[in-house]
Amino acid sequence: MAGRGCGCSPGHLNEDNARFLLLAGLILLYLLGGAAVFSALELAQELQAKQRWEERLANFSRGHNLSREELRGFLRHYEEATRAGIRMDSVRPRWDFTGAFYFVGTVVSTIGFGMTTPATTGGKIFLIFYGLIGCASTILFFNLFLERLITVIACVMRSCHQQQLRRRGAVTQDNMKAPEKGEADSLTGWKPSVYYVMLILCLASVAISCGASALYTTMEGWSYFDSVYFCFVAFSTIGFGDLVSSQNAQYESQGLYRFFNFFLILMGVCCIYSLFNVISILIKQTVNWILRKLDSGCFPPCQRGLLRSRRNVVMPGNIRNRCNISIETDGVMESDTDGRRLSGEMISMKDTNKVSLAILQKQLSEMANGGPHQNSASSRDDEFSGGVGAFAVMNNRLAETSGDR
């Protein structure tokens, strides 16, 4: 190694560790920047609201001949009632069956508006176990939705590309029927760009948000801007709880409204989740680009190449020079991973830092079902490039994650 030859290299830094540290630093800077912006925008409003409240409290105390301590004690009781779901206006019961169903929906989706919380010890204990299974199941559902959505989008875009090539005369009926002719065929190596997929998800999320906002403006009496704000907070599962839909005691066409409210929130969460994961691929690509620049431009010649290359779910080492991100259209996650299964033995401890959770889960499932399916074409390099969660779902659907490139 050149670094050791000149005596100035501190040693190799694993690329995954470098990526993790760089991303952690960027997120910290992002948090600091966000805190500065929100403090500049909201602090003055908070101080003004606090001053107005103190003035109203003093005026009310003088007008009704009440001590400030007595009045504050009464207001604390009101705060406790508010936390228990009691409101001055008429609202729907929080813990009837429909209210409880709305609550468990916010639990398993991780939205957690906070307008309803369990008050009993039994309810809090049950929530811990219920949320453990429910949240994990919902995340699995979101990943499966993401997998199928991307497959559908890619197939539709591939079909459109076929029609475009057919109009140009680049694809004939003969080579459409003979995909085995190899990479020379105009369709074989084509994949839709991830930027188009992100645009489609963006448009779908905006369309759902606009439609839902129109509904909430009509039914809840919110301004359209507040409705759009609620949609983003709910669909992204941030769930502040300052605005919550379907909380009034009565609505016009109440059953229909509650159904559409549930359906729109479900579809919005699925689309925003998918959009976030596609954006995260681009963020990771940007982090990889920064790492390459740091490795090639910021180190002296004797220390260049300190980052130990390692294949990963977004940018494997052997395709590091590719910059066009695109999505595969062939196959799904199950079929993609059939050729990358380990033999029946358990994984040695020295390799546990390389094995993705997705592959480990598949191995355990195979062993529980009597052993894995053998495939002579499997290779050890591909076993560790599956990724985790949504990254595993999109493995081999992006050019940067293709195991054969």
From Swiss-Prot:
Residue span of region Selectivity filter 2: 237-242
Alphabetical list of InterPro entries matching this protein: 2pore_dom_K_chnl (IPR003280), 2pore_dom_K_chnl_THIK (IPR005410), K_chnl_dom (IPR013099)
Topological domain spans for side Cytoplasmic: 1-19, 146-193, 284-405
One Pfam family in the UniProt entry: Ion_trans_2
Is Transport among this UniProt entry's keywords? Answer: yes
Question: Could you give a single Gene Ontology term from the biological process aspect?
Answer: regulation of NLRP3 inflammasome complex assembly
Chain positions covered by the region annotation Selectivity filter 1: 110-115
Which annotated residues bind K(+) 2? 111-112, 238-239
Q: Which residues cross the membrane?
A: 20-40, 125-145, 194-214, 263-283
Enumerate the intramembrane stretches of this chain: 95-115, 224-244
Q: Does the keyword Oxidoreductase apply?
A: no
Question: What terms describe the molecular function in GO for this protein?
Answer: identical protein binding; metal ion binding; potassium channel activity; protein heterodimerization activity
Please provide one cellular component term from the Gene Ontology annotations of this protein. plasma membrane
* This protein's UniProt keywords: Cell membrane, Glycoprotein, Ion channel, Ion transport, Membrane, Metal-binding, Potassium, Potassium channel, Potassium transport, Transmembrane, Transmembrane helix, Transport, Voltage-gated channel
Which positions does UniProt annotate for K(+) 4 binding? 110, 237
Q: How does it assemble?
A: Homodimer. Heterodimer with KCNK12.
Q: State the domain notes.
A: Each subunit contributes two pore-forming domains 1 and 2 which assemble to form a single pore with M2 and M4 transmembrane helices lining the central cavity and M1 and M3 facing the lipid bilayer. The transmembrane helices are bridged by the selectivity filters 1 and 2 that coordinate the permeant ions. Up to four ions can simultaneously occupy the selectivity filter and at least two elementary charges must translocate across the filter to convert it into the open conformation.
Name of the protein in question: Potassium channel subfamily K member 13
- Gene it is expressed from: Kcnk13
